[in-house]
Amino acid sequence: GRKMPFSVYLPKSYDGQKEYPVLYLLHGADGNHNDWMAQGMLNPYASAAEAAGGKEMIIVCPNGSPDGQNIFYCDNYQGNNMKYMTYFFDEFIPYVESNFKVKAGRGTRAIAGLSMGGFGSLYYSFLHPEMFCYVYACSPATAIEGAPNLYEMLGTKDLPGITIEIGKGDFLFGSANSFKQALDGSGIANEYITRDGIHDWAFWKGCLPKLLKKVSDTFEE
């Protein structure tokens, strides 16, 4: 019974007629649905990606910290009673797809996020691989106490394409390397990008051009 705000990027040609693929873009801890717009400069990056020939897409940024709580996009995080994951799949995606001209289907739906949202995007794509064609996790948290264990989900079949991008100076660099090795050990195809950088918006803004291109290239026509 609560109001859940979100932000949306609509392509320049959006007219309420044509349908577009959709990217769900998740924020990090202590953030909100405005972060990718305000700090990540999403609008100019998305416009530039379109101008460079990328597929036009709708980009949706949910609020993953209701009441300012970091709940890692899961149900009952650390014993709280908030069923965020259930809300995301049962209410939020259907709401977006009925209120915007979204081309629904796995081949035209992707998910990405940073830090806590990197965890959320990996978790959701492992939980519902039939829902997403790609997941792009920037500086992801991969082992969270009180949240679902990603390592226990590595047996999931038919996973979407996966990219993990992380800075060599990031405090999560070691855990991301361990998760990359676990992906490889499970025979899960993935792209792993490391470059100079730390856990900050300068790094995450630098992820956006690659993220948008990878998702665009993966979307079905």
Task: Describe the residue ranges of each PLM region.
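Non-catalytic cap/lid and distal C-terminal segments of serine-dependent acyl enzymes
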Residues: G1-E221
